[in-house]
Structures are given as C-alpha cells and as structure tokens.
Regions:
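Transmembrane alpha-helices of multi-pass small-molecule transport proteins
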Residues: 11-21, 26-77, 127-134, 195-221, ...
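Membrane-interface helix-cap regions at the ends of transmembrane helices
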Residues: 42-60, 111, 133-154, 184, ...
Length: 310
C-alpha cells in the first residue's frame, strides 16, 4: 500500500488520541473557547514551522482563495461542529458518525475531480455507512433496554440526539469538502504543511472573530472561568492541538495531495475502531457488542476500498 494512502491511518491515530483527550477539556473550557484556543495554538505552530523552513511559495498564493475557503469549511465550521458533537454525544459515537466523511469524499471526488467510482467501491462505502448505523443504534450497553444510569458520561447524550447526529454529519461534510478544495493546490506542487498552515490560520482567524464578537459572553454554565484555568489545562489543549491538528491534519493534507481523496479519507475513518480499546481503558467499561460489530463494518469497508482501488 503506498505510503501516501497510509497517511489516512496516521491521521486516524492522531485524531483518536485527541478525541480521548477532548471531553474533559471541552467541559472545562466550553466548546467554542476550547476550539478557538486549540486552533489558534495549532495555527501558531504551523506558521512558525513554515516561516523557519521557508515553505510559503508562489504556488500556494496562486490558490490562496480556495485554500482559505477550504479552511473556513473544514476548520472553522467543520471542526467546531465536530467538537460540539463530541460534547453532546461523546467521542465514540461522534467518531463513528464522522466516519461518513469517507463516502462523502469519494462522492465529491467523483463529482468534482473526476475520480471514478466502481461498483465495488460503492459497495465498500455502503459497508462504512452500515457500520455507522449499527454503531449508533446498538453501540452502547442497555441501548435496547433503556437503562442509562450505569453508562459512563461519555456514552450519555447531552441535549437532543438528533442535533448531535446532525452536528457530527455536518462536521464530516465540512472535512470532506475542505479536503476536496485543497487538492488542486497540492496537485500543482504547493507544500502540504504550508497549505495546512493557511487552512488552519484562516480557521483560527474566523474562530477568534466569532468568539470575540459573540461567544465570549455566552459561555456554558459548567465552563470554568478563564482566571481559574490552570497551566495543565493549557498544556493539555496545546498537546491536543499538536497531535490532532498540526500532525494529524498536516499528514492528511499531504496524503490528499499524493493519493486518491476518497481512499485517504476512508482510511482516516477507522477512528471508531481505534477508539474502542482507548475508551475501554479510559472509562473502565467494555464497549457493547454493537460498537464492535459497527467498527468491523467500518474497517471492512475501508479495507475493501483500498483493495478495489489497485
């Protein structure tokens, strides 16, 4: 398997780690403040890397507008929706829903980039979607019996389930469309880290404006006042930004530029599988059988897409 396509798996591992780190930090920061700090930190790191290594070139600026649009869709809108969904649904169910960005990417790549789909690839995408449905409907213990008291907080739903599902699916669409928009610049030879820096920087600017003008005065009641946040809180969010955005997103952007968009994003969709043992260790609760079955379908679909693409 080409290393460019394996980048999807590396991104998935990074996002799994950041998903497990996120719920506690979101609880303390509040979703919008959490995402603003996270993206600003990631943007600053990427900017420093690009300036030191002189990665900004003419090719990047030729595609600047479309890359910035990619950042608005994938980072500002997509990432905000993603971590809002994590807060509402927990990391496991959000990860499973977010896996739909793989078939979305394949469909968008077919529609707008001419990346052809075979019947076998469509079948494999269908397996991913079936896995998502199974994991959502049967993915937590006692889901059919209605007993919720024994559930870990990460498996409980905050607010309406339908809103959480729509947020996660919106995040998946934002990720898929953002990756699609960044590909022309990468194909023309723009540096992947520079593309990632411009995307994340655009998202950071939009988040700072949105937070400063509106959300700063609308923190959730359970969020910790800024003066009470500790250095460990900021160290945690810096680590999360580095793992999930600086490393994970940059690797994914590089893969998108060197391989089929759908294949890379489908491999990045194995987060629901990677997260299961992490949740078992973190929460002390073994995931339900439906979670494992759904995850198996997701992995099988991803593997078949790779198989059918060569």
């Amino acid at each position: 398997m080409p290393f460019a396509e394996l980048s999807g798996l590396v991104a998935a591992l990074c996002w799994t780690v950041s998903s497990l780190m996120a719920p506690g930090l979101i609880q303390r920061f509040g979703t919008m403040r959490f995402n603003t700090f996270r993206i600003v930190i990631a943007s600053s790191i990427l900017l420093v890397i690009c300036l030191i290594t002189q990665r900004f070139d003419a090719t990047l600026w030729q595609h600047a507008e479309i890359i910035m649009l990619s950042g608005l869709l994938g980072i500002f809108i997509g990432d905000t929706m993603l971590f809002t969904a994590v807060h509402r649904l927990g990391p496991r169910r959000t990860g499973v829903l977010f896996a739909t960005n793989a078939p979305m990417s394949i469909l968008l790549g077919w529609l707008f980039l001419g990346e052809n789909l075979s019947f076998n690839q469509l079948f494999a995408c269908g397996l991913v979607l079936v896995g998502v449905v199974i994991a959502i409907l049967f993915g937590r213990k006692n889901s059919l019996l209605g007993r919720k008291n024994s559930l870990h907080a990460w498996e409980q739903t905050k607010g309406k389930l339908s809103i959480g599902i729509l947020l996660a699916l919106g995040a998946a669409l934002g990720q898929a469309s953002g990756a699609l928009l960044s590909k022309p610049a990468l194909v023309d030879g723009a540096d992947p880290i520079a593309v990632s820096a411009l995307r994340v920087g655009t998202g950071a600017l939009a988040l700072v404006l949105a937070y400063g003008l509106y959300y700063r005065h609308k923190q959730p009641a359970e969020a910790i006042p800024f003066s009470q946040l500790t250095r460990f809180d900021f160290m945690g969010i810096a680590a999360l930004a580095t793992i999930g955005m600086v490393i994970g997103m940059s690797v994914l952007v590089w893969g998108v530029g060197n391989a089929n968009v759908g294949i890379v994003t489908t491999l990045s969709a194995v987060v629901p599988v990677l997260i299961l043992p992490g949740l078992w260790i973190t929460t002390g609760q073994r995931p339900a059988l439906g979670a494992w079955i759904g995850a198996i379908f997701v992995v099988a679909g991803a593997a078949l897409i790779i198989l059918f693409s060569h």
